[in-house]
């Protein structure tokens, strides 16, 4: 009997579920919780986007507190963990009860947690308007001064608590330290498998992007486009019918549209001034993509209608 309950080796490897949570994991949980609150508030305000502007402004602190209480009800009150902590396999432990066994947060701790988080945020946002309508000589002025001193002391205490958290790795907020709740792992953590596949892929794509940034300016796009056009133009001439002279004069040999400020390079084809000028600037050996004629003097197209000579 004694041997059955004697010293027995641990069956599971890895740290205990009550082992210390990394500082970065605790801070990441706070970031996720803050992002969730902003997302819920933005979705809530979108429901009133077609109402009168500013309709939620008078009761905005109360509405935010109500939404935060709903989140508290289905996270801390139900599971002793926020949404961010649940995503990171973390939950709160009642550190006031000694021992290695996990103890969830007690009901008073949960209610005090809501009061010190949701209630503190609401009071900080609403405190300015609470004393705004009171005259300067009333007792509200003294109360506001005392309140500002208390808020300053609270911020100083939070700063000291955060410095202690950076040193010891426990109780990242003043509320957790006052209530005696500590983040622990929900399940035992196995050995961390480090995989550099994502990092290697990112480095590969960054290197490929830098290579393209260096290579693309060296490629003459205009010359490449003209070469492709000249490559396929003989095929179209063989399969199609012979183009008339009117077609040459009403269609740019480069873009295929109606010529804008028609110019020629010495052959029978007509070009837009921008098309031919940009190609000649990009490639001094530019040739006509239709007939392969070398570029001569770029001149406006001269048309003879009847007995009159018209210059485009």
Swiss-Prot record:
A zinc finger (RING-type) spans 252-292. It comes from Danio rerio (Zebrafish). The lineage of its organism: Eukaryota, Metazoa, Chordata, Craniata, Vertebrata. PANTHER family: PEROXISOME BIOGENESIS FACTOR 2. Zn(2+) 1 binds at residues 252, 255, 272, 275. This is Peroxisome biogenesis factor 2. The chain crosses the membrane at residues 23-49, 56-81, 106-132, 142-168, 196-219. It holds the Pfam family zf-C3HC4. E3 ubiquitin-protein ligase component of a retrotranslocation channel required for peroxisome organization by mediating export of the PEX5 receptor from peroxisomes to the cytosol, thereby promoting PEX5 recycling. The retrotranslocation channel is composed of PEX2, PEX10 and PEX12; each subunit contributing transmembrane segments that coassemble into an open channel that specifically allows the passage of PEX5 through the peroxisomal membrane. PEX2 also regulates peroxisome organization by acting as a E3 ubiquitin-protein ligase. InterPro entries: PEX2/10, Pex_N, RING-HC_PEX2, Znf_C3HC4_RING-type, Znf_RING, Znf_RING/FYVE/PHD, Znf_RING_CS. Its main location: membrane. Residues 50-55, 133-141, 220-312 are cytoplasmic. Disruption phenotype: Mutant fishes show a loss of peroxisomal structure, associated with high-mortality. Defects are similar to human Zellweger syndrome (ZS), characterized by developmental abnormalities in many organs, organ-specific accumulation and reduction of distinct fatty acid species, such as an accumulation of ultra-very-long-chain polyunsaturated fatty acids (ultra-VLC-PUFAs). It is a multi-pass membrane protein. It comes from the Eukaryota. One of its GO terms (cellular component) is peroxisomal membrane. Keywords: Membrane, Metal-binding, Peroxisome, Protein transport, Transferase, Transmembrane, Transmembrane helix, Transport, Ubl conjugation pathway, Zinc, Zinc-finger. PROSITE patterns: ZF_RING_1 (PS00518), ZF_RING_2 (PS50089). Its EC number is 2.3.2.27, 2.3.2.36.
